[in-house]
Amino acid sequence: MDLFISHASEDKDLLVRPLAARLRSLGYEVWYDEFTLRLGDSLRRSIDKGLSQARYGCVVLSESFFAKQWPQY
């Protein structure tokens, strides 16, 4: 896994989905919830696994991101 993308769901359409798709098209293996999570997966376990396996992390900082409580995790 090359890159883990952390973001607020409100930022998906405008920024995160296009970013993740572009990185994949360039050959990077990206952990992005819409690419990685499957029906019935534990979100927390999947995130923990993605974080532990990714070489790099990308945090999309926005007002929406900071309004969430989970960034304190």
Where are these regions (language model features)?
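Conserved N-terminal substructure of TIR/SEFIR domains
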Residues: M1-V60
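Conserved TIR/SEFIR loop-to-helix hotspot centered on a Trp-containing motif
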Residues: E63-Y73
